[in-house]
Amino acid sequence: MIGFIGSVFSPWYRWSGRKEPQNHCCLNVATYGPGGRFTMTDRGRAALRQSPDTLTVGPSRMHWTGTQLIVEVNEISSPPLVSPVKGRIVLTPTGITDVEVTLKDDGSHIWRPFAPTARIEVDLTQGHRWHGHGYFDANFGTAALEADFRFWTWGRYPVADGAACFYDATRRDGSRLELGLHVAADGRARLIQPPPEARFARSRWLVERHTPADPGTRPRQVMSMLDAPFYSRAMVETTVFGQKTVGVHEALDLRRFRSPLLMPMLAVRVPRRPGWSFS
């Protein structure tokens, strides 16, 4: 689940020239397995309300209580399975970090891993009711991702004493970011040297994938979560620092995403709803 102001994967936002991020906001929800749904309605400025602790986008909202992130979801899923997606998500961090990572030297892209270790309770339609590991972060940017990056991967893996997060990004100028971060359950964070990158099977759309893995071990996909021509999200098993773990892995090919041919395809999955009234 992601709240966007300036929906970076919206074709409508790109077609607008990205002049007004507040006019392209959304609450993106993806559920997996039987009955899985995907919501990413691009909404206009009229649907956006912000306060220091609450983000409201049309009929849905995210609220920070000081100790929990509570998300009230009221969306319609995208084709081919068009139906209401409603319910509540409660994320409780075990600790909050003070980490802020500059992904590009000019400060145009920032990653803020608020709570890589958290508990989550999900109660949504289509029978998606569960609790388990949660994760809470944010990205901030003043430039388009595809303008500054060629490719990146990200992974978050539970380990015995917290979580290990890895960012590997290749910028368009050829420079590279290789970041490892260990976050303890109480939010204490420290930089770590990532194990060597190891390739594993490409996605259904043949997006290249790799993730850190101890020498002599090989990562593998446990479950595909989201596949697009330029993007893969999956549960991946790897071994890091002697621990076998299953976490969430993402791969984003921004060379593919730059193609204007993708935009009409995305418009089917990302409908535009510019009007809204809170009255």
Curated annotation (Swiss-Prot):
It catalyses: rhodopin = all-trans-lycopene + H2O; 1-hydroxy-all-trans-1,2-dihydro-neurosporene = all-trans-neurosporene + H2O. Keywords: Carotenoid biosynthesis, Chlorophyll biosynthesis, Lyase, Photosynthesis. This is Acyclic carotenoid 1,2-hydratase. GO terms for biological process: carotenoid metabolic process; chlorophyll biosynthetic process; photosynthesis; spheroidene biosynthetic process. Involved in the biosynthesis of carotenoids spheroidene and spirilloxanthin. Catalyzes the hydration of neurosporene to the corresponding hydroxylated carotenoids 1-HO-neurosporene and that of lycopene to 1-HO-lycopene. It comes from Cereibacter sphaeroides (strain ATCC 17023 / DSM 158 / JCM 6121 / CCUG 31486 / LMG 2827 / NBRC 12203 / NCIMB 8253 / ATH 2.4.1.) (Rhodobacter sphaeroides). It is an enzyme of class 4 (lyase). Coiled coil: none annotated. One of its GO terms (molecular function) is hydro-lyase activity. Pathway: Carotenoid biosynthesis; spheroidene biosynthesis. Belongs to the CrtC hydratase family. Its EC number is 4.2.1.131.
